[in-house]
Amino acid sequence: TDSAYRLYAAKACGCDVRAYYVETSFQPEFEREDARRLAKELGADMKTLPLNILALDSVRNNPKDRCYYCKNAIFHEILKAAADDGFSCVMDGTNASDDAGDRPGMRALRELKVFSPLRLCGITKKALREYSRNAGLFTWDKPAYACLATRVPSGTFIDEEILARIEWAEGQLANLGFSDFRVRAAELPDPDANASRTPDPDASASGIPASGAPDSGVPHSGTSKRNWAARLQITKDQLPLLLEHQSQILELLKTRFSQVSLDLELRAPSR
């Protein structure tokens, strides 16, 4: 909603403007499709910039300030592309309802001198929805959406596999009529990790693990045989829908997650 209205306003004012969409594994397909649809409806030029965000250790290792490194990498790509295209100002969709404190993502925007006109003009999320509806933008009532990486707890290694599982699970729930919800993922212990095995005394004595593989001393990257639990966060008004489809949801999600549960601290509506 935020960036959509900012693009609309720039076009309405006759500005020479170009939209940039940085395509990473953190964005689901519907976000990409919405961006393309918006640009087409507004007659705006949009350039897609592919970025392998998980190539960055500071992102895939998922520290508490992951958002800083991610936002920094994304806007570095945008700033470079914008400069190459002859643009001198880069704007984002941060609004006055967003916390301007020392959040990691906000810190990256400040350091890179990215301009946030909606926030500087005091335009709130509520006002943006009203303005967007009056402008006829399809995004006016779109629920707030955070990237897929936010579904994984800080400190848990992020890989393509879990992002794909989360996107798939949220897509299944959306197909059942859910909106404004999250599927949170938590890694479970490997059920085979404690399996009994007979150690090889000779192998142990030689410094080779009983598995027969040499010990590289490198920590496990977290990319093989990972075991996950899914925790659903929905709004109170969607509880009847959940009960209606409980068996179907379990059957679907248990194909990708070992455990499926409901967060009883229900999600506050993001509208």
Q: Which role fits each region the language model picked out?
A:
Residues 227-244:
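A short interface-forming secondary-structure element
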Residues 142-162:
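Internal, active-site/partner-interface "lid" segment
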Residues 186-204:
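Long, compositionally biased low-complexity repeat segments characteristic
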Residues 120-126, 155-167:
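Active-site glycine- and acidic-residue-rich loops that bind
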Residues 160-183:
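Short amphipathic alpha-helix segments
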Residues 179-191, 224-231:
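Short edge beta-strands and adjacent turn/loop segments
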Residues 1-134, 192-196, 215-223, 230, ...:
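ATP-dependent adenylation/nucleotidyltransferase module used to activate substrates
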Residues 125-130, 137-146, 179-181:
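Short, structured loop/turn "capping" segments at alpha-beta junctions
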